[in-house]
């Protein structure tokens, strides 16, 4: 007798710098899908992608979820398959809806979304276009600019222009003519603050450019601003909904990777204490930003807000936001009256719309 439960394939890990974050997010998502509330709705098949991009079946995936760490060599069957995707693991044929819990390149950038699209199967989150545009900060910012959405001044740098001392100095001089210190140097295609540097002077700018260039050919350099960091969650496909607005507070100089994912290094204010009308503006901008880049399913839209100037800037969109214990996306929906268990259920249902 066929099962009445929907079979959900949760894909996690991935060949990116955010592999460990993906594992932590997957633990939360799988736990919520297998909760007492959802147990009669969903059957979960976990699939693990190792750091070389190889896809592994449920046996390996469950071990990784249990240990909360990347797979050890002895856990992977030999001989090892070639690097990268070769075929879907055993058991995948039963999957009805795919749930990618992948952060960074090869998971959040439209590549795995393209695979699911070719397979003709529904999946959680944005499609190829929305994922690709939102992942690449330069493409995303160009779309925001074309739509007239507010953002801080920024400039693009190509890693090919940093190959020798004279070129590097020329790039730095050009940036200094356009931006003031401090500024932030970012790889265009990484998330979770991986590879980002804050530059207060020419030397730090050059170091930051080299660091970003080691991770990505496309580099963004943004004007630093004195601002609060606010976030809004978006859910839905045909009709997008927004959560309350939350604020990230931290003692560090800026919201880097360690601050983002370490216990007691930051705290949240949900809802964020904001002047009348500001939350409504941010929620409206969040919807406009998602529509601008064709993002749907789920997204977290990040903002900068300067109260003294009453100015709001779009920072970025994350189409596969984290689901760790420190992640804002599920917390924002919890504060908006949607439990974690109901949230993952809605995401799976939305995938089939």
UniProtKB/Swiss-Prot annotation:
Cofactor names: Mg(2+); Mn(2+)
Assigned GO CC terms: cytosol
One Gene Ontology term of the molecular function aspect: metal ion binding
Keyword tags: ATP-binding, Cell shape, Cell wall biogenesis/degradation, Cytoplasm, Ligase, Magnesium, Manganese, Metal-binding, Nucleotide-binding, Peptidoglycan synthesis
Cell compartments where the protein resides: Cytoplasm
Pfam families membership: Dala_Dala_lig_C (PF07478), Dala_Dala_lig_N (PF01820)
Domain ATP-grasp, first and last residues per copy: 141-349
Binding site for ATP: 176-231
GO BP term, pick one: peptidoglycan biosynthetic process
Gene3D superfamilies assigned to the protein according to its UniProt record, in alphabetical order: 3.40.50.20, ATP-grasp fold, A domain (3.30.1490.20), ATP-grasp fold, B domain (3.30.470.20)
EC number: 6.3.2.4
Source superkingdom: Bacteria
Binding site for Mg(2+) 2: 316, 318
Entries under InterPro entries matching the protein: ATP-grasp (IPR011761), ATP_grasp_subdomain_1 (IPR013815), D-Ala_lig_Van_CS (IPR000291), D_ala_D_ala (IPR005905), Dala_Dala_lig_C (IPR011095), Dala_Dala_lig_N (IPR011127), PreATP-grasp_dom_sf (IPR016185)
Pathway the protein contributes to: Cell wall biogenesis; peptidoglycan biosynthesis
Cofactor binding mode and count: Binds 2 magnesium or manganese ions per subunit.
Binding site for Mg(2+) 1: 302, 316
Biological function: Cell wall formation.
PANTHER family recorded: D-ALANINE--D-ALANINE LIGASE, D-ALANINE--D-ALANINE LIGASE A
Family recorded in the similarity comment: Belongs to the D-alanine--D-alanine ligase family.
NCBIfam families assigned to the protein according to its UniProt record, in alphabetical order: D_ala_D_alaTIGR, PRK01966.1-4
Protein's recorded name: D-alanine--D-alanine ligase
Source organism (scientific name): Prochlorococcus marinus (strain MIT 9303)
GN (gene name): ddl
